Curated annotation (Swiss-Prot):
Hydrolyzes diadenosine 5',5'''-P1,P4-tetraphosphate to yield ADP. The gene is apaH. PANTHER family: CYTOCHROME C5, PTHR40942. It comes from Aeromonas salmonicida (strain A449). One of its GO terms (molecular function) is bis(5'-nucleosyl)-tetraphosphatase (symmetrical) activity. NCBIfam families: apaH, PRK00166.1. Keywords: Hydrolase. It is an enzyme of class 3 (hydrolase). The lineage of its organism: Bacteria, Pseudomonadati, Pseudomonadota, Gammaproteobacteria, Aeromonadales. This is Bis(5'-nucleosyl)-tetraphosphatase, symmetrical. Belongs to the Ap4A hydrolase family.
Length: 273
């Protein structure tokens, strides 16, 4: 059995299937791990959701910012934008079934037997692994419960940008969501910054990638994430794997296989802007 981790798909269904063929992924025995942002910007968000859902327990995916935004659009919180290419999904007969399934995906996923943790954007430098797990469960329970509409209506915003155990209510939930789904850079004091989407060498002075501010402990799991295409897979750390390589922007879709540490990529030139 192989554990195959894939970066942001964003509706690029054909590229995903081509990559899985290249990696010889076998859904009868392998497990597909997806770093979130299954939908938006690419041509086939509907096919992508249907396929991943059809894999059942052979697919593990976490929520990304585009996935949450889709849920917000469906709930009337945000407008449907043409550039997101979600119209077919919104009009699909199985829309509600797919969105309910998506709403029940986690913010953080872990392998039950291997030292691997997966999120979409990252884990706050202020959190250890236990805090990250607990924070993820807090928001997941809201998304899966009666308060999910309230949460979607109030999740947008950049503040608070710093963590405190005293945070409560929507301010606490917003920080948790932003950390797991939007974060790239932090200020040196640990506060989150959301405007810069460039790579570390092009960033504004005073900012550092979130993973450079995380201390490494020997018993920490390998952390796998997506979201940050400008990294092109480079974190400079063996314990932190970045897998978003900009498929929807015409670069490539990348798969990392845990068992042999193989990186497999397929070019996606048809999406070049």
């Amino acid at each position: 059995m192989a554990n195959c981790f894939v970066g942001d798909i964003q509706g690029c269904y054909d590229d995903l299937r081509r990559l899985l063929d290249l990696a010889k992924f076998d859904p009868a025995k392998d497990v597909l791990w997806l770093c979130g942002d299954l939908v938006a910007r690419g041509p086939d968000s509907l096919k992508t959701l249907r396929y991943v859902k059809s894999l059942g327990q052979r697919a593990v995916t976490v929520l990304g910012n585009h996935d949450l935004h889709l849920l917000a659009v469906a709930d009337g919180v945000a407008p449907l934008k043409k550039k997101d290419k979600l119209q077919a999904l919104m009009e699909a007969p199985d829309r509600d079934e797919l969105l309910t399934w998506l709403r029940h995906r986690p913010l953080l996923a872990e392998h039950p037997d291997l030292p691997i943790m997966m999120v979409h954007a990252g884990i706050s430098p202020a959190w250890d692994a236990r805090t990250a797990r607990n924070c993820a469960r807090e928001v997941e329970s809201l998304l899966r419960g009666d308060q999910y509409s309230w949460l979607l209506h109030n999740m947008y915003g950049d503040l608070p940008d710093g963590w405190s155990e005293d945070l409560a209510g929507i301010e606490r939930y917003r920080y948790i969501i932003n950390t797991f789904t939007r974060m790239r850079f932090c200020y040196f004091d640990g506060r989150l910054e959301f405007k810069c989407k460039k790579g570390p060498t092009e960033s504004t002075p005073g900012l550092r990638p979130w993973f450079e501010q995380r201390e490494h402990h020997m018993d920490d799991p390998i952390l796998v994430f997506g979201h940050w295409a400008a990294l092109m897979g480079n974190t400079g750390r063996n314990d932190i794997k970045a897998l978003d390589t900009g498929c929807v922007w015409g670069n490539s879709l990348t798969l990392w296989r845990y068992e042999d540490d193989a990186l497999i990529a397929t070019p996606c030139p048809t999406h070049a802007k």
